[in-house]
Every structure is written in structure tokens, then in C-alpha cells.
């Protein structure tokens, strides 16, 4: 049955207007994004099938272009639309945090880093550069690929910190597997970067590992 024949309170768009986006299921939110279904399949049913195919919303949103376009009813138009929505969300959150004290609590940092890194299909090493009040000066993704001593150069972090006149930095990287447990390589590179930053009087406040769930803080584990 077409969605237009559903009771009004069950239609995703009307439900969002009446109850807010938080009241919608993943499939209902995705149905609004899709707008239409395919022949004989409503947008909500198509959304359910896609979530089952990709293994959930996270996997769908972080899929590569090739993987995404293999989904029923999906193509380049929907892929570019999704990327635009994700980028707008990132920029909106960054604008908010530019006006706030980033390190007022670790939760501010966790929220921001989750939005930036959780959906990336590859490993990304990023740095938050902060002023003396711990306000965000700049977020920059410095390295891509496997995070180890050969891929991350402490001097590049120091160079960028001096360029932005940062008083402190927060490191972050994601684990595309979704498992946010820090590795020995993560701990080792954190120590190397901390010692390099100490030489130029820039504080390393923390290093977060982003996966599914809450990002893990190395500082909270006594590893910074």
C-alpha cells in the first residue's frame, strides 16, 4: 500500500511534524530521505530492505559510492544528496562548537568527533586545535590510512599547532571496524606526539578513539 493511503499519524512526514524527528524509527527517517519507493514497494518498506541489506544506518551512511549505488532504488543522485546532508550536519556542529568552550566537558568533544569520524569508511587521524580558553580554532584531518608510527608524523602535528597558534590540541582517530579499543600503536603515537608538543609548549589534552558507541578517551584511562 502506498504511504499516502496510510493513516496520517503513521506517515513518516506527518509523524515528524507532529512528534519530532526523535520519534521516528531509522526506517522512517530513511524513507523521508528516499522520498519514494519503487514499483509495488513503499518508501518505508524500501528503507527497511536497505537497512537489512547494509546492516544498519551506520553502514549505509558510511558506504562507499560503489557500495551505496548497489542498493535498490539508490544511485548517484541519492549518494550526492546523502553526502551533502552529512557535510551540512558536520558544519552545523562545528559552527556551534566554534562559539563554545570545547573542553568544558569531554561530552562536547565526544559529540563533535562522533559526527566527524564515525561514518568514515577509512581510518582518519584528526586534530582539534584549541586556544587558551580551549575554544576550537580548527579541526583538521591530517593523516589517512592505518594509524601507526610510519603513517603519523609528530612534526606535522607540531607544525600545524604552531601555524594555528594553538595552546592545546586534542587528537582523534576512528576505527572503521566500530571497535574503539585503543591499540598499542595508538598509545605509542600518542606518547610521541605529546613529547614533540611539549618542546613547543603546546598541551596535549587527550586522544579519542572513535567507533560505535561513545568515543574512548585515552586521558580518562591515564594514557596521556
From Swiss-Prot:
PROSITE patterns: MPN (PS50249), UPF0758 (PS01302)
Residue stretches making up the MPN domain: 102-224
Biological processes per GO annotation: proteolysis
Renumbered ranges of motif JAMM motif: 173-186
Protein origin, superkingdom: Bacteria
Pfam family, one: RadC
InterPro entries (alphabetical): MPN, RadC_JAB, RuvA_2-like, UPF0758, UPF0758_CS, UPF0758_N
Residues the record lists as binding Zn(2+): 173, 175, 186
Keywords carried by this UniProt record: Hydrolase, Metal-binding, Metalloprotease, Protease, Zinc
GO molecular-function term, one example from the UniProt record: metallopeptidase activity
Assigned protein family: Belongs to the UPF0758 family.
Name of the protein described by the UniProt record: UPF0758 protein Mmwyl1_0624
Organism: Marinomonas sp. (strain MWYL1)
Amino acid at each position: 500500500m502506498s504511504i499516502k493511503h496510510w493513516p496520517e499519524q503513521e506517515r513518516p512526514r506527518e509523524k515528524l511534524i507532529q512528534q519530532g524527528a526523535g520519534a521516528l524509527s531509522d526506517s522512517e527517517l530513511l524513507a523521508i530521505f528516499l522520498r519514494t519507493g519503487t514499483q509495488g514497494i513503499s518508501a518505508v518498506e524500501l528503507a527497511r530492505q536497505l537497512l537489512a541489506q547494509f546492516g544498519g544506518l551506520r553502514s549505509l551512511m558510511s558506504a562507499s559510492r560503489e557500495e551505496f549505488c548497489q542498493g535498490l532504488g539508490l544511485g548517484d543522485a541519492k549518494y550526492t544528496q546523502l553526502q551533502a546532508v552529512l557535510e551540512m550536519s558536520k558544519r552545523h556542529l562545528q559552527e556551534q562548537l566554534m562559539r563554545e568552550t570545547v573542553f568544558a566537558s569531554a561530552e562536547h568533544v565526544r559529540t563533535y568527533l562522533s559526527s566527524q569520524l564515525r561514518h568514515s569508511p577509512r581510518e582518519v587521524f584528526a586534530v582539534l586545535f584549541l586556544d587558551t580558553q580551549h575554544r576550537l580554532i580548527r579541526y583538521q584531518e591530517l593523516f589517512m590510512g592505518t594509524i601507526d608510527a610510519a603513517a603519523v608524523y609528530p612534526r606535522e602535528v607540531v607544525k600545524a599547532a604552531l601555524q594555528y597558534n594553538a595552546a592545546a590540541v586534542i587528537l582523534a582517530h576512528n576505527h572503521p571496524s566500530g571497535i574503539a579499543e585503543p591499540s598499542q600503536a595508538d598509545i605509542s603515537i600518542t606518547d610521541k606526539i605529546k613529547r614533540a608538543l611539549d618542546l613547543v609548549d603546546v598541551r596535549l589534552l587527550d586522544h579519542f578513539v572513535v567507533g560505535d558507541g561513545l568515543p574512548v578517551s585515552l586521558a580518562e584511562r591515564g594514557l596521556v
